[in-house]
Amino acid sequence: MRTQSILRIPLLFFVMQISAIQLSAQFYDYPYQVLDSFNLSITYSIAWKEDTNNLERVRSEKMILMVGKEVSKFMSKNFYEYSNMGREAERAGLLQEFFDRNERQNYRTRFSYQILKNYPKGSYTYYNKVLPDFFQYAEPLQVFQWELLDETDSIGNYPVQKAHCTYGGREWVAWYTSSVPINDGPYKFRGLPGLIIKIHDEKEHYVFILDVIERYDKYFDIEFEDMGWVTTTRENYLMAEQNFRLDIISRAKEAGATAVSMQRAYRSMLKKNNPIEF
């Protein structure tokens, strides 16, 4: 594990990997350690508006929360399924055939981050790729200062109660149910007296809502991939993401209209101006 300050990311790496399929970080190619096991998963739908200049455009995707005995893990469901397929192909000696089938186009995702909760104990670990490096940072699980409110409602078949917190530059409204005694939820959110069924920021730029709870007949591993992570802080990580975006835009402007790939990068990054945290 390396520790270093985060520098501005060269544009070259982004131009080489401009595709929105962030699954280019192939986690199944790396050694990993098993942290826990789960036989219960919770799928959430996320709807988000990534462009503040076009709030009518709403994107959506499925995310998965794997609930272990001690550790839980949250990530893109497409990313999870694609990584598992790749690892199975690698174990069977069929990795090249797997690449040749180009399965990745069926498992597109905007989210390559992964979040481990209660790893290390009492903290969560957020890890992601900001080209060209892999970064991780940790924060205390108790980072959320929830305000429990009296308002109640129902979502689907679940009676829910309202809660509020401030995090990542946004005001968040959560609806949780004590009928599912799991103090967890989507993204980094946890710590309420029951499962979070729905949570959104007050502008509804990011909305997570429960899709399905599944229990399996067998247990699956919760893994942490050893990718030579650069350990940093949340603040420095967010700064790296912002610097990455600004670097793309400034260099694309300097490149002129003849640099097609840079102009494509410029247009793409202009539309991704509304991160979940800032």
Predicted regions and their residues:
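Extended soluble regions of mature proteins
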Residues: 28, 33-278
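Bacterial Sec-dependent N-terminal signal peptides
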Residues: 1-32, 276-278
